[in-house]
Amino acid sequence: PYCYNISGESIIRQFAYGIRKIRSHFPDVEFVTYSVEEPCFTSSLPQILRLFGFKYASLKCPNTCWGGYTAPYGGELVNWTAPDGTSILTSPRYACEELQPNSVWQTTAWGNETPYIEACIRQDIAHPVGMCYQDAGWRYGPWIGSGDSIRNNSIYVTWREYFERISEGRTTDDYRFPQEDMHVSLMWGSQVLQRIAQQVRESENKLVMAEKAGVIANLANGYRYGQATLDEGWRTLMLAQHHDSWIVPYNGLNRQGTWAQH
């Protein structure tokens, strides 16, 4: 989900249910770095990430700025600091990472090209990151190249390797990220987007109310509510919070209707 358009409780459930699902298939998986393809950020994330055991984060989405992007700030690393004071070591959208000329969806980091790297060097960024997550199935990537054709001698590493083996691994630059530094743009959808937002918020409120009522009933008279039913309610709500439900609500789904209709 985009995170800036749903409740804090929903963000927590997205992590809780998502981590549980992944561990049902990969029991030994570790969750170390939060990095996303789309602009799925909000100011309170450092606190939530820390509670789920994450150590690092990235504020970059250089090839998916349709739905938004973070404000440019800082150099190689920052301590992304939430309103409550919780911080997490983060690779930001650098102060020198500009919006790509003649593009409405990219920053200059998307292709790790020479002008971007030179701008990073001028800003004393020793280990610039040029990254772009791509949807599974795209035929024309990876954009930075592969095999013997990798642009500017780029090196592919995981975020964990970058933070722990390549970067300095620490910084004194505390970035107190306000919600206003999340520059958002849900430009497709108009009236249907308003309806989606209203229905999602109504469902968020009703699910939490149902859980509270169930707890009170259990304490009062031993009533045992159906956890599986509530889990299914959260599952379908979380699908409605998927970023594509908001950014492209009129897109078709395998000739089975649109995101909005489902």
Residue ranges of predicted features:
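Catalytic-domain carbohydrate-binding cleft regions of carbohydrate-active enzymes
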Residues: 1-262
